[in-house]
Regions:
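N-terminal "arm"/small-domain region of PLP-dependent enzymes with the aminotransferase-like
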Residues: 1-67
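Structural signal for conserved beta-strand scaffold positions within catalytic alpha/beta enzyme cores
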Residues: 87, 133-135, 224, 354, ...
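Conserved PLP-enzyme active-site core in the AAT-like
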Residues: 11-16, 20, 64, 82, ...
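Conserved N-terminal alpha-helix of the aminotransferase class I/II PLP-enzyme fold
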Residues: 49-94
């Protein structure tokens, strides 16, 4: 391998060489650098379609990288302080599932918080592993799930010494972090791997002012969404591995589910964004921290809103807080987070990341400007003035501890029947129900449907949350396990 530094972007450089070669394409894709689809070329631009190409010798192959993709992955591993990095083009969903499928199989136990992304539970459906849930605590005012308490994780390890792995969110969607170093040390002492969903933590590697990143904490694997806070294209992700993992086997697992037609647009975006973070990441992340701190102060000065931050830290369930997260509690305005989300989009042309029952998340990252923050703050102030309601009628919980009856795979593939949702109390759910975003299941296969959950679903629907998962997309019916 030639000498490479973080100033290089091997995939981008190879694509530039390919363009200069002026190859005549008798391969796929069929648009032939855009000539075969002028409408697409007009919409996306010739520069984009010029590099929407298939694998070839000079561009390497993601399924078996031996040249420029291998070099780009090496540079990414170096930038993120990992032993190896796998470029992923199926989103961090693919990275999370690869972590789990590489570590556990049918009947194996994996310790995890219940407030995981649906991709983690989907992986359990695929492999048949048994989740040992550590239910996170609830922040009483905000109603959101906290991190896993270290003692609770340790207790789960003691009860299930045969567990193969521990799965951790770092951070959660709301910015909350568990004590990842302590959990990792305890897990390794018990012979368990540590897998980290770091979808919302790419930026943690480029600041000393933020919570500890997974690789720095000694985790065995971490899935990072470069497209969320790293600046790459949507659907691009990186799977980081320590030298404790069998890399050849992990690569085989990835190739079971990942496409054989990897997009070079996505791969190049990962490569270029890694270079940008490696060279300018600390400066950029410092600027983001400052922008969010300013926004937090301004929003809290409006009244009724609560943009929360490091004051939540308790050294345990909230061991640390990601201060780039602009999470805003809206209940005191009498408006659900999803209502503020909708008003911002429909009346003010401001698109935030998500709104749920009582919280709103404005995702601030590498592309944001001070004037955008000012516009958001002004809109929130006007919404409070024009839309404020009696807050006493709002629901208070974002997270409900589930009653787990059987493992997700058994429930998902079991004989099932479809019932009107109002008739499902006490039955065992055989599918997912979730608000998306954030994609954390309200119900997962194998869990009992309770009054509290049904109330939450009805309220979320009424307030306009996008509920996904069930076969019946109208959410009038649910699939439940057939009673015997």
């Amino acid at each position: 391998m030639p000498y490479l530094s973080q100033t290089n972007a091997p995939i981008e450089e190879a694509l530039v060489r390919m363009k200069r070669a002026r190859l005549v394409p008798f391969d796929v894709p069929g648009h032939k650098r855009g000539r075969g689809n002028p409408e697409l070329a007009a919409f996306l631009g010739a520069a984009c379609l010029d590099v929407d190409v298939n694998s070839m010798k000079m561009l390497d192959n993601l399924c078996h990288p031996v040249s420029v993709i291998r070099d780009a992955e090496h540079l990414a591993a170096e930038a993120f302080r990992a032993a190896h990095a796998f470029f992923m083009v199926s989103g961090t969903t693919g990275s999370v599932q690869a972590m789990i499928l590489s570590t556990v199989g049918r009947g194996d136990k994996i310790i995890m918080p219940r407030n995981v992304h649906r991709s983690a539970i989907n992986a359990l459906i695929l492999c048949g592993a048994v989740p040992i849930y550590v239910n996170p605590g609830i922040e009483d005012t905000l109603g959101i799930a906290l991190g896993m308490r270290t003692d609770d994780v340790a207790a789960a390890m003691e009860r299930h010494p045969d567990a193969k792995a521990v799965f951790v969110n770092n951070p959660t969607y709301y910015g909350i972090c568990s004590d990842l170093r302590a959990i990792t040390e305890k897990a390794h002492a018990c012979g368990m791997k540590v897998l980290v969903d770091e979808a919302h933590g790419t930026h943690l590697y480029f600041s000393d002012r933020l919570p500890t990143a997974a690789m720095d904490a000694g985790a065995d694997m971490a899935a990072i969404s470069m497209h969320k806070s790293g600046g790459s294209l949507t659907q691009s992700s990186i799977l980081l591995c320590a030298d404790t993992m069998p890399l050849g086997y992990v690569h085989q697992i990835i190739n079971i589910t990942q496409t054989t037609s990897a997009s070079y647009l996505l791969l190049a975006s990962l490569d270029i964004s890694r270079r940008n973070l490696a060279l300018r990441g600390r400066e950029v992340i410092d600027r983001i921290i400052g922008l969010v701190a300013y926004a937090r102060d301004e929003i809290n000065a409006i009244g009724d809103y609560y943009a929360y931050g490091r004051e939540l830290i308790d050294g345990d369930a909230v061991y640390d807080f990601d201060t780039t997260k602009l999470s805003i509690f809206t209940r005191a305005t009498g408006l659900a987070g999803i209502e503020v989300y909708d008003i911002l989009r429909d009346d003010y042309d401001i698109q935030t990341e998500f709104g749920d029952i009582a919280n709103l998340l404005a995702y601030v990252s590498v592309g944001d400007r001070p004037k955008d923050i000012e516009r958001l703050v002004a809109a929130l102030a006007e919404i409070r003035r024009n839309y404020r309601k009696d807050p006493s009628k709002t629901l208070k919980m974002e997270y409900i501890d589930p009653v787990v009856v059987c493992v997700p795979q058994d429930a998902f593939y079991a004989e099932k029947e479809s019932l009107p949702i109002q008739e499902t109390k006490g039955r065992i759910c055989a599918e997912f129900v979730m608000c998306y975003p954030p994609g954390i299941p309200i119900l997962a296969p194998g869990e009992e449907i309770t009054d509290e959950i049904l109330t939450y679903i009805r309220y979320a629907k009424k307030k306009g949350c996008q509920i996904t998962g069930p076969e019946d997309m109208s959410i009038q019916r649910l699939n439940v396990m057939t009673e015997r």
